[in-house]
């Protein structure tokens, strides 16, 4: 895309510094927010921000949500340019569902440990070991992996997707081992093979921390993302009577927001990336939301800084490209998921 020469705040843009950890040098203050909104209008662009983004990025966005919901919004909005504040696979998914639109990500180096835990070559080799198996991939995967997938799923509909597959068919579930274990536990399916991938942030929220927080806040509700390694611990605590079963909820990010709007609890413990707390507090300002692990911050999500956003809008970078043939195959796996049932609260 073209640079918006002469139409931006040069003094602000000149502060942007690139370094190993990403772009810095600009604060997400009111002047920055005004400039972002002005540049979005000049570019005819809409800004989509994931739930795990920095609060100032979420607050300036046109839409905030999970990756699949945002990608579907990208396909529906009238703007021809989409700025996706998230990690790279999310921007890829937006491009897959909106191939005719220009998709920008403020820093293309913002990767994902979960998406990177399986490659297309590894998936093809796994498929060769299980001929005839149905491949179910979490939407948190690259375009190349989606292109090798039969049906995509989100954390909110993974059980429904797997249950739709004939019981005598083997299922290869990738890449998240904890979501896969959750699906196997709920469906009781013995022919479900699970890839040993994980999100480094969710895997780092451990059962001991969860148990300590539950004991310290016995009247709280507990929202646990199924990518968490501690999801099994949460169910164990409930089963042992250490925590009331009706207060333990295994939820996608969208499911957490729905539950927050309806909860009668005064306090909620949240086991997911800490950026989610911003949206939860906006949804239910009278509830005390606390992170089970306040260090559970995704360094890749946080690479989308105010400086990165400003540089993106000034320079029209970084543009996301997906090979058309790969995108067409990947799009089919997402469409099959939608045909089975609405993806609901996404990842």
From Swiss-Prot:
Localization in the cell: Cytoplasm
Segments crossing the lipid bilayer: none
Listed pathway(s): Cofactor biosynthesis; NAD(+) biosynthesis; quinolinate from iminoaspartate: step 1/1
Any one biological process term the GO annotation gives: 'de novo' NAD biosynthetic process from L-aspartate
Catalytic activity: iminosuccinate + dihydroxyacetone phosphate = quinolinate + phosphate + 2 H2O + H(+)
Chain positions recorded as iminosuccinate binding sites: 50, 67, 138-140, 155, 225-227, 253
Annotated positions binding [4Fe-4S] cluster: 112, 199, 298
Domain of life per record: Bacteria
Gene Ontology cellular-component terms listed: cytosol
Enzyme class name: transferase
Cofactor notes: Binds 1 [4Fe-4S] cluster per subunit.
Obligatory cofactor(s): [4Fe-4S] cluster
Major place of residence: cytoplasm
InterPro entries: NadA, NadA_sf, Quinolinate_synth_type2
Listed GO MF terms: 4 iron, 4 sulfur cluster binding; metal ion binding; quinolinate synthetase A activity
Pfam hit, one: NadA
UniProt EC number: 2.5.1.72
HAMAP family assigned: NadA_type2 (MF_00568)
Family (UniProt): Belongs to the quinolinate synthase family. Type 2 subfamily.
The protein's role, per its UniProt record: Catalyzes the condensation of iminoaspartate with dihydroxyacetone phosphate to form quinolinate.
PANTHER family with a match to the protein in the record: QUINOLINATE SYNTHASE, CHLOROPLASTIC (PTHR30573:SF0), QUINOLINATE SYNTHETASE A (PTHR30573)
Entry protein name: Quinolinate synthase
Top-level taxonomy: Bacteria, Bacillati, Actinomycetota, Actinomycetes, Mycobacteriales
